[in-house]
Structures are given as structure tokens and as C-alpha cells.
A protein has these predicted regions:
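Conserved beta-loop-alpha segment that forms the PLP phosphate-binding cup at the N-terminus of a helix
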Residues: 6-16, 197-204
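A short glycine/serine-rich beta->alpha loop
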Residues: 101, 186-192
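Anion (oxyanion) recognition and catalysis
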Residues: 14, 37, 64, 121, ...
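Short glycine/threonine-rich catalytic loop with a Thr-x-Gly-x-Asp
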Residues: 72, 191-198
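Glycine-rich phosphate/pyrophosphate-binding loop at beta-loop-alpha junctions
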Residues: 10-11, 16, 49-56, 78-172, ...
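A glycine-rich helix N-cap at a beta->alpha junction
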Residues: 18-58, 62
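Short, small-residue-biased leader/transition segments that mark boundaries at the very start
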Residues: 1-5
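Residue-level detector of anion-binding/catalytic polar loops
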Residues: 19, 42, 128, 191-192
Length: 225
């Protein structure tokens, strides 16, 4: 599971009485594990060296072992992009009065950037979309996947729901910058956000400084709290 989905699934399970099993890499943050368990979900950790692919494989195996189980398959679930097309993109369009010039979003499952980017480009083909990836694992730009600490983005595979044609460019962010900008969000803006949010904001600042976006609206998605 990625950084946010584990909490959401655990919350639904608690509210509806479902047994919820969350599989995540052992490298996920302590607070993520504690919070997910606090909602009553079971947490199974997979080796950090296997990345998110290892967690996906473990979840698939559990799905075959446990009768009546349902696999969310967030990296392959079309509901992800669909809900962002219907909600996130429409909210951005409405709140900017249709003046959004660029969208910056991290690429984890691919749901956010795919759904939001597709819909914004339908509304205005001139909107530019930027995907954010860890510099340490530049898979989106043809590089080698590798371990990194920016939980929530940069799985060590290309998710099936990620529309790689929707983004105009990919911005690679160093681990140290992601941490720094996450802290700056808290200290300077009062927004306590996660590391992937720090990476996204750092990328958005780079985009905003491009001459072509002077005086224009650049929207960044801050997904992790």
C-alpha cells in the first residue's frame, strides 16, 4: 500500500467491520505503521530491498490464500484515476476559474496525475503536467529503479494505471531536497506534510520559476500528511 491508502482502507474496515490486511515495505515510516494498526488493521511488512513490488507480490499471495478476500490492487485499479478525473481535476478547475497553467504531482500509483492530468488537458490542452519522481529511482525517465526514502512516490515498477502520455515532463528530486521542503512546509506555512509532498513542492517551485509560467497559476498536489 502507498502512504495514504493504508489509512483509508483501515478506516473503512474499522467503520464497517471488515478485516483489513495492509502489506507495505518495512522501510515505510513508523508513524504509518502505528497509525494503520491503530485503526485495527493488520500490517505485514516485506523486505525493503524488494520495494513496493515485493509488497504487491505478497498481497497477491495472501489473496489466493484467504477465502473471500478482495484485493484492492491500487496500482492497477481504474477507480484511482476515475475519482481524480471526477473530483480533483474539477475542483482545481473551479477554484482557479479555469486559469490553471500547470499541474505538478508525484507519481506513486499514478492515479492522481493520470486522472487529474487527463481531465485538465481535456478542459484546456495548453495545461502542462509535470510528474515528480525520486532522483534516486528515475524509472519514469528510463533510469534504473532503486530504493529511496521518499515514501509514496517512485515504486520500483511502472503502474498499469499510470498514463505516461499525460505528463509533459518529469522532475527528479533529490532525497535531501524532499526532506528539506517537507520541513519548510511545516515551519513556514504551518502545513505538516510528508516527504513526498516536500518533493512535489520543491518541483512546483522549479516549475513556477520557469519564464513561461511568470504570473500564472501552478497547482501542486500535497497528498501526504
Amino acid at each position: 500500500s502507498d502512504v495514504c491508502s493504508s489509512d483509508l482502507l483501515a478506516m473503512v474496515g474499522a467503520a464497517r467491520g471488515y478485516r483489513v490486511i495492509i502489506v507495505m515495505p518495512e522501510s515505510m515510516s513508523l508513524e504509518r505503521k502505528v497509525l494503520t494498526r491503530a485503526y485495527g488493521a493488520e500490517v505485514i511488512l516485506t523486505p525493503a530491498t524488494e520495494g513496493m513490488a515485493g509488497s504487491v507480490a505478497k498481497a497477491e499471495a495472501l489473496g489466493k490464500e484467504i477465502p473471500g478476500s478482495v484485493l484492492v490492487r491500487q496500482f492497477d485499479n481504474p477507480a484511482g484515476p476515475k475519482i481524480h478525473r471526477e473530483t480533483t481535476a474539477e475542483e482545481i478547475w473551479k477554484d482557479t476559474d479555469g486559469k490553471v497553467a500547470a499541474l505538478v504531482a508525484g507519481s506513486g500509483t499514478g492515479g492522481t496525475i493520470t486522472g487529474t492530468g487527463q481531465r485538465l488537458k481535456e478542459l484546456n490542452p495548453d495545461v502542462k503536467v509535470y510528474a515528480v519522481q525520486p532522483a534516486a529511482s528515475p524509472l519514469l525517465t528510463g533510469g534504473q529503479a532503486a530504493g529511496h526514502p521518499i515514501a509514496g512516490i517512485g515504486p520500483n515498477f511502472i503502474p498499469s494505471i499510470l498514463d505516461t502520455s499525460v505528463y509533459d515532463d518529469v522532475i527528479s528530486i533529490e532525497n535531501s531536497d524532499a526532506f528539506t521542503w517537507s520541513r519548510r512546509l511545516g515551519a513556514e506555512e504551518g502545513i505538516l506534510a510528508g516527504i513526498s509532498s516536500g518533493a512535489a513542492v520543491k518541483a512546483a517551485v522549479e516549475v513556477a520559476h520557469k519564464p513561461e509560467f511568470a504570473g500564472k497559476i501552478v497547482v501542486v498536489i500535497i497528498p501526504s500528511f
